[in-house]
């Protein structure tokens, strides 16, 4: 197993503390030059907390951040999103090496471009890219929402890719669920046998 964590709540708290307003486009946080450093600091700190918590439970965990063992190479998602990256390559050799040594990789959803510039990556997008690259059997997305809701706001317990795409097109799926569901679709269309949102 491996764990890719987000940092949305911690990032929001830090930005609020500094009176910096967040903007979102299609569920993705617009990240400017000032914000990327804050995002990185919050992610690294949260990563350390997860490692400590796991070690207290006698679990061997290895930190994966852009400072230590960067595994995600990115390109800019779009100019309007700023320092938001789209994964283009995952270093699976490093991940497999860590896993074979019986460590659980704890991964921050950030990556570096060819010039070494750091980029924020939506955690679900990063998880999907890693799952596809490793040809994982399952991708579990843990979230604070119930899951996919239909137009009557009833929970959809199972959905096919084409049905999910229709729900995005007609805006039944919106906001932060868009990148989550797009990740699910890309994962199952690229070799991951199943995706579960819990």
Residue ranges and their predicted role:
Residues 1-197:
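Nucleotide/pyrophosphate-binding catalytic subdomain
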């Amino acid at each position: 197993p491996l764990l890719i964590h987000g940092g949305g709540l911690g990032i929001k708290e830090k930005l609020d503390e500094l009176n910096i307003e967040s903007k979102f486009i299609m569920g993705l946080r617009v990240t400017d030059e000032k914000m990327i450093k804050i995002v990185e600091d919050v992610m690294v700190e949260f990563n350390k907390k997860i490692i400590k918590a796991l070690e207290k439970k006698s679990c061997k965990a290895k930190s994966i951040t852009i400072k230590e063992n960067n595994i995600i190479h990115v390109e800019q998602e779009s100019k309007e999103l700023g320092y938001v990256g789209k994964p283009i390559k995952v270093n699976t050799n490093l991940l497999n090496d860590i896993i074979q040594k019986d460590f659980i990789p704890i991964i921050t959803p950030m990556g570096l471009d060819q010039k070494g510039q750091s980029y924020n990556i939506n955690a679900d997008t990063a998880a999907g890219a890693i799952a596809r690259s490793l040809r994982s059997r399952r991708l579990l997305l843990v979230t604070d929402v119930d899951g996919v809701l239909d137009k009557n706001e009833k929970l959809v317990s199972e959905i096919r890719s084409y049905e999910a795409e229709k729900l995005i097109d007609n805006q039944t799926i919106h906001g932060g669920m868009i990148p989550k569901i797009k990740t699910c679709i890309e994962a199952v269309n690229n070799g991951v046998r199943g995706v579960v949102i819990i």
